[in-house]
Amino acid sequence: MAEQIDLKTFKTDVADYEAARPEYPIGITDWITDEFLIDETSIILELGAGTGKFTPRIIASHPKEIIAVDVYPEMLDVLRKKFPNVDCRAGSAMAIPLEDESVDLVLCAQCFHWFANEEAMKEIYRVLKPNGKLGLVWNTRDDTVPWIEKVSKILGRYRKDAPSFVSWKWAELFPGHGFGKLRYCAFPFSRCLTVEELHTLMNSFSFIYKLPEEEKEKVHAELDEIAKTIPRVQNTDQIKLCYQTMAFSSEKEPAK
């Protein structure tokens, strides 16, 4: 069973998070539209919306309304400035500020592992309309690339017991708690960034951000050594970071 999580254990620099975290591949919009049958009547809740990294892909599916909820007001402030037509509300997965059976789809990008517990599942079930859907999305690094695998090992060393996608504990909730089996899709993509931006990306992980400065310096020194071995994109100072976007869907089942 997935464990109860204190959301306040997640802490990072909002500017670093917004600057460094990747966007999502364009193909994910087709997944949203086709998997969840989104049209001009659909109301979508983006739960754990953060600074709005995933929001453009939802907007591109052209629903009737998007409601963005996050526990951190400072992240919502960034989202609100970027997308003023999105209804932003402070709240958590354990206390969603919406009426019963009010949305067609709940989407969680890069965050469900932080609140993968029975209380959150009950709340998600509550706000979904009958036959409503739940979508879970994560950008994951492609560890088949040797240098990316080395970076992931550094992160794994410091992640310890921090909630994460890679633990798969979140998946223990399905099927169950009013939801059916998970369906799965994957979308490969890549992005180019400088070594400096790679350092900023490293800082955006909460368990790195919270390290003592001396320990953090060791992490970045190790990252510099790895960076020396990474091929540059032709005629630039950039490197290519490869990802897989992993997308899961489930449907609300009738109450028993």
From Swiss-Prot:
Domain of life: Eukaryota
UniProt GO MF annotations: methyltransferase activity; trans-aconitate 3-methyltransferase activity
Annotated protein name in UniProt: Uncharacterized methyltransferase-like C25B8.10
Annotated Pfam families: Methyltransf_11 (PF08241)
GO biological process: cellular detoxification; methylation
EC number from the UniProt entry: 2.1.1.-
Lineage, top ranks: Eukaryota, Fungi, Dikarya, Ascomycota, Taphrinomycotina
UniProt main location, coarse: cytoplasm
Biological role: Probable methyltransferase.
